[in-house]
């Protein structure tokens, strides 16, 4: 089944806050309301940016596509006022770089790094439904396996929770990149201040097994000092509910 993105209103912003700003958000219902209101009011803008992101080819064999994808992410970060936005290259030449940025909060005692990856799996057209094209995002009334029909993106920016976007990496893992950055956007534009320093790290080789991730981490170890990493990638629970995994074996 091709990747799909679920338009649950809390998905793009709230699940990240439940990890990153637990001491801020969970204890203050007005903050939760403000974040949800922001996501609802700005859904059209958020999805327009996301579909533009999905339209950029990001498979490992397409070097130019990966470069454009990384540049798009840097633009997303710069527009949100994130500092020190840059590419982190490996020692090995020609390797897809990680995209980095940071927000340092005066007085913060902890630093968290949020991880997602911007590369996608190879595309096999034979495995895609006939009405789908990997890098042309399409909106459906519900999941295809539930009889979803292709519908137009709404001009009024109002989205139903049952709707789905289908495209390569709509879930794994451009959704992770977009969710993290829109969560930060919702936080700041709702007048809320993070309780910790935030660093952003978006990898470009995860689907290839991250063969040069160690090089990047070692080369840029000073910049990547932190207390914890939060990985915004992983399988969807069979219930469809959002989940936080605190560790895995191996």
Briefly describe each language-model feature range.
Residues 28-168, 189-194:
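Acidic/His- and Gly-rich active-site-bordering loop/insert found
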Residues 4-6, 245-250:
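Short, intrinsically disordered, charge-balanced linker/junction segments flanking boundaries
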Residues 1-30:
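Bacterial Sec-dependent N-terminal signal peptides
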Residues 20, 107, 130, 193, ...:
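A generic structural signal for short, non-catalytic loop/turn and secondary-structure boundary residues
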Residues 156-248:
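Acidic/histidine-rich catalytic neighborhood of metal-dependent amide-processing enzymes
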Residues 22-23, 68-70, 130, 216, ...:
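Residues in and immediately flanking transmembrane alpha helices
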């Amino acid at each position: 089944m091709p990747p799909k993105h679920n338009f649950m209103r809390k998905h793009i912003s709230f699940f990240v806050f439940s990890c990153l700003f637990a001491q801020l958000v969970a204890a203050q219902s007005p903050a939760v309301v403000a974040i949800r209101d922001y996501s609802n009011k700005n859904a059209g803008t958020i999805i327009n940016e996301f579909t533009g992101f999905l339209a950029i080819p990001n498979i490992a064999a397409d070097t130019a596509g990966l470069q454009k994808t990384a540049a798009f992410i840097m633009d997303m970060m710069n527009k949100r006022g994130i500092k020190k936005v840059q590419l982190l290259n490996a020692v090995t030449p020609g390797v897809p770089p990680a995209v980095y940025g940071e927000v340092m909060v005066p007085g913060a005692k902890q630093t968290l790094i949020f991880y997602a990856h911007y590369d996608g799996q190879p595309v096999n057209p034979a495995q895609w439904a006939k009405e789908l094209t990997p890098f042309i995002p399409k909106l459906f009334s519900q999941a295809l396996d539930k009889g979803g029909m292709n519908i137009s993106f709404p001009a009024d920016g109002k989205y139903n929770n049952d709707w789905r976007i289908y495209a390569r990496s709509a879930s794994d893992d451009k959704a992770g990149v977009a969710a993290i950055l829109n969560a930060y956007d919702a936080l700041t534009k709702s007048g809320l201040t993070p309780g910790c320093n935030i660093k952003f790290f978006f990898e470009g080789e995860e689907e290839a097994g991250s063969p040069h991730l160690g090089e990047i981490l070692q080369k840029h170890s000073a910049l990547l000092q932190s207390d914890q990493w939060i990985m915004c990638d992983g399988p969807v629970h069979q219930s469809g509910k959002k989940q936080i995994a605190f560790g895995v074996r191996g």
